[in-house]
Regions:
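A conserved structural motif in NAD(P)-dependent oxidoreductases
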Residues: 123-134
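Catalytic Tyr-X3-Lys loop
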Residues: 15-35, 49, 53, 77, ...
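Active-site helix of classical SDR
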Residues: 37, 73, 81
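Short C-terminal tail/terminal secondary-structure segment
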Residues: 11, 62, 139, 150-163
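Residue(s) in the substrate-gating loop at a strand-loop-helix junction
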Residues: 57
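Alpha-helical segment proximal to the catalytic Tyr-Lys
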Residues: 42, 86-90
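Substrate-binding pocket helix/loop in short-chain dehydrogenase/reductase
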Residues: 12-14, 21-23, 108, 116-119
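Short, small/polar-rich loop/turn modules that mediate ligand/substrate recognition or access, typified
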Residues: 89, 94, 149-151
Length: 163
């Protein structure tokens, strides 16, 4: 299962955020990820095999200004991945996630040009992630070549996070 729930939400300070925006971002990004994981687990346990790849974000590790709901929701995806990785390992189910820096996808349609420029300035590689690069990482991570890793958080940040 490749689980890529995500919306950016408003680009606002916490003071300017309203509770409905906060809940909407977390419902899609974190709750959506939770429910997709949940509905797969029983069948995977019955097969004694499964691979789940959740798509988080580098914002979940580092936070982004004026994007607290998005950052918090993606941090939740990382924590959920780690928890499920431990919880399901005995059933030969691997649960991992990637934490990409920004990739030019439809989520950019929700962002201001200033915010897009800000994000690019934080990536030492000086470019956005190509979705084909992410796809290659995902294919490997869910393959049998990677049968040992679970609860893993694979960094695709172009050098933004180096820890």
């Amino acid at each position: 299962v490749i689980n890529s729930a995500g919306i950016a939400g408003p680009n606002k300070t916490v003071e300017d955020y309203n509770i409905n925006d906060w809940r909407r971002v977390n419902r899609v990004n974190l709750d959506g990820t939770f429910f997709v994981n949940k509905v797969c687990i029983t069948d995977m346990k019955n097969e004694n095999y499964g691979r789940i790849m959740n798509i988080a974000s580098i914002a979940g590790k580092e936070g982004n200004p004026n994007a607290s709901a998005y950052s918090a929701s993606k941090a939740g995806v990382i924590a959920l991945t780690k928890s499920l990785g431990k919880e399901l390992a005995e059933f030969n189910i691997s649960v991992n996630c990637i934490t990409p820096a920004a990739a030019k996808t439809r989520i950019f349609d929700q962002m201001s040009e200033d915010h897009i420029s800000y994000m690019l300035s934080k990536i030492p590689r000086g470019r956005f992630l190509d979705v084909k690069e992410a796809a290659k990482m995902i294919v490997w991570a869910v393959s049998d070549e990677n049968s040992f890793t679970t609860g893993g958080v694979f960094d695709l940040s172009g050098g933004r996070a180096t820890y």
